[in-house]
């Protein structure tokens, strides 16, 4: 009960979006309440299409956009009156923009990314800044950029992104006092450290795997169906040989593909650490999974068309 009252003080930016849309519509109703999520999903899909079309081709970009838009978990979040889709869109768009910034050798200030990070932080807290900065930083480090330059460049971005949230947090602290501060620490620090004073969505690590498999329905069925059409070869060589080939494959991977893979691996691993786990936490990896799934569908079309026919 006390935490329920404290949560009421955390008015998120998606709530302001609902208020703005409802003002234009003249009333608060189910339509205006769900509109921010729908608009956020639309923006995320369109930006993702442009991002991949430029780097990997229009065909794979279009298929990835359709897969993102129509899988169960993203579709559910896109029509719900919740903060999750707004957070996801802001994080994913920031990830795209920070990649483009890296292509420009980290020159200038990625203002679109900064604004998206600020909106993500206002939606769900510091994680909206930390994760989108961590992924491109790791990517650039793997590609041989100097660590100190990467660190200070993304530190600058993070500091700029904290300006707007800091103003809001200060105003909220003036109104809520220590109760608000306790809530912020509980939700953003103690949750990650597993030291929350109350149980909140506690699940084992395998729960995240299960939610992604279920959340990507119906396309997980395509993956299962295709297994019966693939050709398998007996593994040859030692484990060390396999590992060397894997490392070489990663090093030679196209930049956009490697970046998409890192988005999936880092974000997924991050959310496996805290005890608190929910399916919606993993929404930011869905557009990047869609990219690889789109490539797989194109592969099946050329090599194993019957798998697609059986799927439907």
Predicted feature descriptions by range:
Residues 4-8, 12-306:
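Membrane-integral, polyisoprenol-dependent glycosyltransferases
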Residues 310-312:
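Transmembrane helical bundles and short interhelical boundary loops of multi-pass, membrane-embedded
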């Amino acid at each position: 009960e006390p935490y329920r009252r404290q949560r009421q003080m955390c008015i998120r930016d998606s709530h302001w979006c609902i208020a703005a849309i409802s003002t234009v519509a003249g009333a608060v109703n189910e339509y205006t309440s769900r509109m921010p999520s729908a608009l956020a999903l639309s923006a995320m899909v369109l930006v993702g299409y442009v991002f991949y079309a430029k780097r990997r081709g229009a065909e794979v970009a279009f298929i990835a956009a359709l897969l993102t838009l129509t899988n169960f978990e993203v579709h559910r979040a896109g029509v719900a009156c919740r903060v999750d889709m707004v957070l996801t869109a802001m994080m994913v768009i920031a990830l795209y923009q920070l990649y483009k910034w890296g292509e420009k050798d980290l020159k200038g200030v990625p203002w679109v990314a900064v604004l998206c990070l600020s909106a993500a932080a206002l939606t769900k807290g510091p994680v909206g800044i930390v994760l989108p900065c961590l992924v491109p930083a790791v990517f650039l480090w793997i590609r041989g950029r100097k660590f100190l330059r990467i660190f200070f460049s993304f530190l600058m971005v993070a500091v700029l992104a904290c300006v707007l949230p800091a103003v809001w947090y200060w105003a909220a602290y003036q109104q809520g006092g220590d109760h608000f501060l306790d809530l912020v620490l509980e939700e953003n620090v103690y949750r990650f450290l597993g030291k929350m004073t109350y149980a909140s969505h506690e699940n084992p690590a395998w729960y995240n795997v299960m939610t992604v498999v279920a959340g990507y329905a119906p396309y997980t069925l395509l993956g299962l169906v295709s297994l019966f059409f693939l050709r398998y070869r007996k593994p040859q060589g030692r484990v060390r040989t396999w590992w060397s080939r894997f490392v070489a494959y990663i090093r030679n991977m196209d930049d956009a593909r490697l970046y998409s893979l890192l988005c999936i691996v880092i974000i997924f691993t991050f959310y496996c650490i805290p005890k608190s786990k929910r399916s919606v936490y993993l929404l930011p990896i869905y557009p990047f999974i869609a990219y690889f799934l789109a490539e797989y569908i194109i592969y099946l079309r050329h090599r194993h068309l019957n798998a697609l026919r059986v799927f439907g």
